[in-house]
A protein has these predicted regions:
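Conserved mid-domain beta->alpha element of the FAD-binding
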Residues: 8-17, 119, 170, 274-360, ...
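A conserved short coil-to-beta-strand element within the FAD-binding core of flavoproteins
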Residues: 133-147
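Flavin (primarily FAD) binding-site architecture
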Residues: 170-184
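Core beta-strand elements of the Rossmann-like FAD/NAD(P) dinucleotide-binding domain
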Residues: 157-167
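N-terminal Rossmann-like FAD-binding beta1-loop-alpha1 element of flavoenzymes
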Residues: 2-29
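Active-site-adjacent segment of FAD-dependent monooxygenases/related oxidoreductases
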Residues: 41, 46-118, 122
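Conserved FAD/dinucleotide-binding core of flavoprotein oxidoreductases
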Residues: 80-114, 155-159, 209, 219-276, ...
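C-terminal helical "tail/cap" subdomain of flavin- and related membrane-associated enzymes
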Residues: 328-448, 468, 472, 479
């Protein structure tokens, strides 16, 4: 019997299995698909996700090599067409060397299929993971202290079987059938817009030689959508709006899609191959509950975040990092069942903030449309022609472009989110969302433990790499007392186990006798002004929801 059943083997489901395995927890990972994803879909793998990957032995540096270099995918461009006039540009996220002050691994543009392939290789090699493609979970119900599942062979529906597990994670996507079967409702708008994702192959390097970028927003009247450059030499997507109520998907033939691509590029192309055409609906919803009994929602099944901001996939990875160590602690007898209640308490607010920001990003793009087209439909062409000729004569255009910055730089949301729950002792208040690009490292309880470049045995490395992803870490001040008899807690002494160029008191705001207790997910669980057995054990009892 698997300890945990994971339904859905996308990046979130695979990451859940790998994280659980790191804690010694075996899982069964199933997916109804018989083949892996080929369409590019998501591409922004942010700093926090890369840090999590690195913590489980998936080299973040090697992952970043799969993505577009910053000089290829480091800009967002607002254009008429791909080859038409350009009205402004912005850096795409924090890919500059300055980001290394806050994270060892800046965001990288990695097509989702490539990211999934790397995860899949690690999953396939992990003896703790039973990985089954072509397996549909048709029923998942709470049954006392277990979860009962019915699994069906996707290739032969006459073959089905039942199994029991201690817990289950539903990572089965935005249209989660498990969420629906649990009667968990979603909050927020269900259908903001409808798009066709037209995935095509073409070598457009010659056309973008002087305007490399990852996103090209198209504003020429009659040209709608966004071009996404996953690889300028071969892999592109045109996001094209459509109306499913008045249009039929079958009307979008390859020939019609090729014509739309020509229009978006601004000239007729040769050597274009339309690979895939798939519809999708932009929503902005968060589940009212992340848990029902012993079944948990994670990733898109828990939140449908608009793609404007690249926060969806990364939020899902954050979900399972938060959940996995808690499940492992309970299953290994180290924590009480109540610890699992903190999953929703901590992750749901993060999803709501990310959802709201992504929705605001999408809405702000309309301000740019108005700046370019005006508010009189009959004069759209006239205004656009004037702006195309003399964009500097329209200062409101530059302001509208500048206002898009939060869309493409949400560094604080990506690595600066905080938690406030019973699994944090005396958490600092969570501040209101301000400038989402302005990340300020915090040493407060509940905050993500800050990255520092430190030296150990002559080697420069991130302090993150010394924090255990498998157990609690006690980072002690230079004059603090060592705690004996706690083999399950990793202890680090500031200035001895590693060297930092800055002062402990200046960094942490704690006396040299103090310490920080850091959870396996890298969040600060509590702060100690002095380290003593009584306070330490009291904190452990609260953090792990133990009644002893």
């Amino acid at each position: 019997m698997p300890r945990v059943l994971i339904v859905g083997a996308g990046p979130v489901g695979q990451m859940a299995a790998l994280l659980l395995s790191q804690h010694g927890i075996p899982s069964l990972l199933v997916d109804k698909r018989t083949t892996r994803l080929t369409a590019p879909k998501a591409h922004a793998v942010n700093a926090r996700t890369l840090e999590i990957c690195d913590s489980i032995g998936i080299s973040a540096s090697q992952l970043r090599e799969l993505g577009a270099a910053a000089n290829e995918g480091g800009m967002v461009r607002f254009v008429g067409t791909l080859t038409g006039p350009e009205f402004g540009s912005l850096p795409y996220e924090r890919q500059d060397v300055g980001a290394l002050e806050s994270t060892p691994f800046p965001l990288s543009n990695i097509p989702q299929p490539l990211f999934e392939q790397v995860l899949a290789r690690h999953v396939a090699e992990d003896p703790n993971i039973d990985y089954r493609l072509g397996t549909t979970c048709t029923s998942l119900i709470n049954q006392g202290e277990q979860v009962a599942a019915t699994l069906l062979d996707s290739r032969d529906e006459s073959r089905s079987h039942s199994l029991l597990s201690d817990y289950a994670i539903a990572a089965d996507g935005a249209g989660s059938s498990i969420r629906d079967s649990l009667d968990i409702e979603m909050e927020g708008p269900e259908a903001l817009a409808h798009y066709l994702m037209i995935h095509f192959s073409a070598d457009l390097r010659a056309l973008t030689e002087n305007r490399r970028g990852v996103l090209y927003f198209l504003f020429e009247p009659g040209v709608n959508g966004t071009l996404i450059a996953y690889d300028h030499s071969k892999t592109w997507v045109l996001m094209h709006p459509w109306q499913p109520g008045s249009e039929k998907l079958e009307d979008y033939t390859e020939a019609r899609c090729a014509a739309l691509i020509d229009k978006a590029v601004g000239q007729s192309l040769n050597g274009v191959t339309v690979e895939n055409i798939s519809p999708w609906t932009m929503t902005a919803q968060v589940a009212k509950a992340y848990r029902k009994g012993r079944i948990f929602l994670a990733g898109d099944s828990a939140h449908r975040i608009p793609p404007a901001g690249g926060l969806g996939l990364n939020s899902g990875i954050g979900d399972v990092q938060n959940l996995s160590w808690k499940l492992a602690a309970v299953l290994n007898g180290l924590a009480g069942e109540r610890l699992l209640d903190t999953y929703e308490v901590e992750r749901q607010p993060v999803a709501r903030i990310n959802n709201e920001q992504s929705l605001n990003n999408a809405i702000k793009l309309f301000d740019l449309i108005v700046a370019l087209h005006g508010d009189d439909p009959e004069k759209t062409g006239e205004r656009y022609a004037a702006i195309s000729t003399s964009p500097n004569d329209f200062p409101e255009l530059a302001e509208a472009v500048k206002a898009q910055k939060p869309h493409f730089d949400s560094f604080d949301l990506q690595i600066g989110y905080r938690y406030n729950s019973l699994a944090i002792v005396d958490p600092a208040p969570i501040p209101d969302v301000g400038d989402v690009s302005d990340y300020q490292p915090s040493w407060d309880a509940g905050a993500h433990f800050p990255h520092r470049w430190v030296t150990q045995d002559g080697e420069t490395l991130s302090l993150h790499s010394l924090i255990s992803p498998q157990t609690l870490t006690l980072l002690r001040g230079p004059r603090s007392s060592e705690l004996s008899g706690h083999s399950r807690v990793k202890q680090l002494l500031f200035g001895v186990d590693f060297e930092d160029e800055d002062d402990w008191e200046m960094l942490t705001g704690l006396p040299t006798s103090g310490a920080l207790l850091i959870r396996p997910d890298g969040h600060i669980a509590t702060r100690f002004k002095t380290v003593n057995e009584e306070d330490f054990l009291s904190a452990i009892r609260q953090i792990l929801a133990r009644g002893d």
